[in-house]
Amino acid sequence: MLLATFKLCAGSSYRHVRSMKGLQQQAVLAIGQELNRRALGGPAPAAWINQVRRRGSLLGSQLEDPLYSDQELAYIQQGEEAMQRALGILKDQEGWKKESRQANGDEVLSKVIPDVGKVFRLEVVVDQPMERLYEELVERMEAMGEWNPNVKEIKVLQKIGKDTVITHELAAEVAGNLVGPRDFVSVRCTKRRGSMCVLAGMATLYEEMPQQKGVIRAEHGPTCMVLRPLAGSPSRTKLTWLLSIDLKGWLPKTIINQVLSQTQVDFANHLRKRLESCPALEARC
């Protein structure tokens, strides 16, 4: 009931929200996001009310923040929706089937989700603190092509606020040309929830990055990585990666399943090697 009431009020005051300055918009958006989170079984009211209050306390001193455009607000909302959908998929523990399990404990699971298709879930433990993974996967995102052979290049096309970016990713061809050149345009959203960090995203449209000649524009479905300190061993990190991709084109399902499952296993191995060879961001590897 509370969520429905807020949505009704928000819809009737949309023009008023658009006239607000940046932080005012963020405060209103935060309330909507947290109400959605509560509807999905999120934290108690006191926690998110304090977060909104902290944002609101900055309004008086930063009223000159630029407005977000309608398109930027749409990207922010799309990133939030991708995160909520991906976390909802991970939250449901029923129906997952084992695809592979490595000697080091790395495990890939899969599940068919209505309106999404087959998704893959990687579960690994990395012998590095969470902050180090955050540096590599978020702050140095554009350097991923240096250490992940499955990625030729990632570029940040636009940054919106502190949590949302639009990216273009050019994937490497799979050995034997089983899967030809693909690229992805995605909206990505990064959030911290207590000791947990969530990196989420999905396909989006971006006029300044049209489809490239000779490259198939594939699409990420709701996808995310969840990072959290390993219980009882905070210097290590539990990484969960939900992968949902529509590769487009005509490809047998057996090949798609094999490629995506192996992509996750390879990613974990390459990430570990990167972290071992470049233990800190300051090293400027």
Curated annotation (Swiss-Prot):
Tissue: Corpus luteum and adrenal gland.
Subcellular localization(s) per the UniProt record: Mitochondrion
Domain START: 67-280
Superkingdom classification of source: Eukaryota
Gene Ontology molecular functions: cholesterol binding; cholesterol transfer activity
Any single biological process term in GO: intracellular cholesterol transport
Sites bearing Phosphoserine, chain numbering: S57, S195
Role according to the record: Plays a key role in steroid hormone synthesis by enhancing the metabolism of cholesterol into pregnenolone. Mediates the transfer of cholesterol from the outer mitochondrial membrane to the inner mitochondrial membrane where it is cleaved to pregnenolone.
Listed InterPro entries: StAR (IPR029866), StAR-like (IPR000799), START-like_dom_sf (IPR023393), START_lipid-bd_dom (IPR002913)
Species per Swiss-Prot/TrEMBL record: Bos taurus (Bovine)
Span of the transit peptide along the chain: 1-63
One GO CC term on file: mitochondrion
SMART domains the UniProt entry points to: START (SM00234)
Keywords recorded for this protein, A-Z: Lipid transport, Lipid-binding, Mitochondrion, Phosphoprotein, Steroidogenesis, Transit peptide, Transport
Predominant subcellular localization, coarse grouping: mitochondrion
Name of the protein described by the UniProt record: Steroidogenic acute regulatory protein, mitochondrial
Residue stretches in coiled coil: none
Alphabetized PROSITE patterns for the sequence: START
Pathway connected to this protein: Steroid metabolism; cholesterol metabolism
Catalytic reaction annotation: cholesterol(in) = cholesterol(out)
Subunit structure, as described in the record: May interact with TSPO.
This protein's record includes keyword Transcription: no
Disulfide bridge partners, by residue number: none
Pfam families: START
